[in-house]
């Protein structure tokens, strides 16, 4: 059970791959990658199934998707544990991820009807009707940080709209993908409607470049997203939806309850071991005694964050990063910032060789003149002290990204001022910036995406509008155009 093509499970014909629990390096999944021929077979299966899937109609498609929701409910404990073991995230957090997957079904159905349903109006020219049709065959590339929820957020609306899908998950989370697709199979999804190909870069390239794709929906790094954007530049007929990362700012201004502010900072910067695309990377705190007090409390709170394996009891706030490589990357990022003039307030350390376990870090980068505009994808928060609000907003906007941003402030006037000037697709006030609603769009500007917001707006890129003017019979107009006689 590695690849799912035309409703059947197949062994891979490529090279050996394995998935390890990043908290203890135990191997939890093995398989072989999909070859280009197997990718072709998956695309062919999706193409053959697409028209019949569309012609079932929305209600019939929804019934199958709702059966999948029932499968998620029945298997939520196993799915949450699988996500925890493969990503290293604590069990409390993976349970919330599965809950989000279940909730996505109703939200996606509502979004389909609201964003891409059918509307008819009588006009003097005839009955004007707006309908929506699926693009056809689409690929979904999933990330490792939310290996269930984020690809689910593409797959469910794509299927509801009548598309067929080839799912290529992260090579770091193949077991989660296999379990997800097995639940779709149990839900009675017709053969070829959803196909799974596992693999690394070569598999991804074979799928992304396939001439029979009508679209590709991607969640992942800005680097890979930009590569896909370049690849699709000469194909205006294909829909490309990119959901990428961010170098996200959080500004603190005039907050009286600094304990509450510290809580929101911790939730913004360190949840999921900093491996959320919306995590705060840069923290802007006012100069002065109040800012000093907040930073002192924050540093103490960061030192007290509990870190541990996915199954530790009592449960930790932070689990493992996705791999030892990722952990070492964060140590290197911290060293680079220190070399540039940063001052460590709480040192990020690699806790155990061979694992992805790291402690959270806090570094004052105020003295760095040219702060690197990088998304350091882990639990390292960069602190900048500012003298006035306009300076803070200017610094916050000094990024090529534009995913999330936030303001913790007691003044509504300050928030309105901030909201009008900050450049980001997700802007929160007095809430953690990792908090997003599935009933709202999710996406950013700049290097964070290509204006294809997901979540509630995923329906928009899963179908295209068809405008019609209709009449029940062919009839001669009462008045002919000048120059015509009949």
UniProtKB/Swiss-Prot annotation:
The enzyme's E.C. designation: 1.2.1.71
Residues annotated as the enzyme's active site: 243, 277
Disulfide bonds, paired cysteine numbers: none
Catalytic activities: N-succinyl-L-glutamate 5-semialdehyde + NAD(+) + H2O = N-succinyl-L-glutamate + NADH + 2 H(+)
Pathway(s) annotated for this protein in UniProt: Amino-acid degradation; L-arginine degradation via AST pathway; L-glutamate and succinate from L-arginine: step 4/5
List of residues binding NAD(+): 220-225
Record keywords, A-Z: Arginine metabolism, NAD, Oxidoreductase
Keyword Glycosyltransferase in record: no
Any one Pfam family match given in the protein's UniProt record, by short name: Aldedh
Biological process per Gene Ontology, one example term: arginine catabolic process to succinate
Molecular function terms, GO-annotated: succinylglutamate-semialdehyde dehydrogenase activity
Functional description taken from the UniProt entry: Catalyzes the NAD-dependent reduction of succinylglutamate semialdehyde into succinylglutamate.
Family: Belongs to the aldehyde dehydrogenase family. AstD subfamily.
Identification of the protein by name: N-succinylglutamate 5-semialdehyde dehydrogenase
Source organism: Shewanella baltica (strain OS223)
Biological classification of the source: Bacteria, Pseudomonadati, Pseudomonadota, Gammaproteobacteria, Alteromonadales
């Amino acid at each position: 059970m590695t690849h799912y093509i035309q409703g059947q499970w197949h062994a891979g014909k490529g090279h050996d791959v394995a998935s390890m629990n990043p908290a203890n390096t135990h191997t939890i999944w093995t398989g072989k990658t999909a070859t280009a021929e197997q990718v072709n077979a998956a695309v062919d299966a999706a193409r053959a199934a697409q028209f019949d899937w569309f012609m079932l109609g929305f209600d019939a498609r929804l019934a199958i998707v709702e059966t999948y929701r029932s499968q998620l409910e029945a298997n939520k404990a196993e799915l949450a544990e699988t996500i925890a073991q493969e990503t290293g995230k604590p069990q409390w957090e993976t349970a919330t991820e599965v809950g989000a997957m279940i909730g996505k079904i109703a939200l996606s159905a509502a979004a389909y009807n609201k964003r891409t349903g059918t509307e008819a109006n009588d006009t003097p020219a005839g009955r004007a009707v707006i309908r929506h049709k699926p693009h056809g065959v689409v690929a979904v590339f999933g990330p490792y940080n939310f290996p269930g929820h984020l690809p689910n957020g593409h797959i469910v609306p794509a299927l509801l709209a009548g598309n067929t899908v080839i799912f290529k998950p992260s090579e770091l989370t193949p077991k989660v993908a296999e379990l997800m697709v097995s639940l779709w199979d149990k839900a009675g999804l017709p053969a070829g409607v959803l196909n799974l190909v596992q693999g690394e870069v070569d598999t991804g390239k074979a799928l992304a470049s396939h001439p029979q794709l009508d679209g590709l929906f991607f969640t992942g790094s800005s680097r890979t997203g930009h590569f896909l954007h370049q690849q699709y530049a000469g194909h205006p007929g294909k829909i490309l939806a990119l959901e990428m990362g961010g170098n996200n700012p959080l500004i603190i201004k005039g907050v009286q309850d600094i304990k509450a502010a510290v809580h929101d900072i911790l939730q913004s910067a360190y949840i999921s071991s900093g491996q959320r695309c919306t995590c705060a990377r840069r923290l802007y705190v006012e100069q002065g005694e109040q800012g000093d007090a907040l930073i002192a409390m924050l540093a103490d709170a960061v030192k007290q964050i509990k870190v541990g394996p996915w199954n530790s009891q009592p449960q930790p706030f932070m689990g493992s990063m996705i791999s030892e490589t990722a952990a070492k990357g964060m140590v290197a990022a911290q060293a680079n910032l220190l070399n540039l003039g940063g001052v460590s307030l709480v040192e990020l350390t690699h806790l155990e060789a061979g694992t992805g376990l790291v402690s959270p870090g806090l570094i004052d980068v105020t003295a760095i003149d040219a702060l690197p505009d990088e998304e350091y994808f882990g639990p390292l928060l960069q602190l900048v002290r500012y003298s006035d609000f306009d300076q803070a907003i200017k610094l916050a906007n000094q990024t090529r990204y534009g995913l999330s941003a936030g303001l913790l402030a007691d003044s509504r006037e300050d928030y309105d001022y901030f909201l009008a000037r900050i450049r980001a697709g997700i802007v929160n006030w007095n809430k953690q910036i990792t908090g997003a609603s599935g009933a709202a769009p999710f996406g950013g500007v700049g290097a964070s995406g290509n204006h294809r917001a997901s979540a509630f707006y995923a329906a928009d890129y899963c179908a295209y509008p068809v405008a019609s003017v209709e009449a029940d019979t062919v009839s001669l107009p009462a008045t002919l155009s000048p120059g015509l006689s009949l």
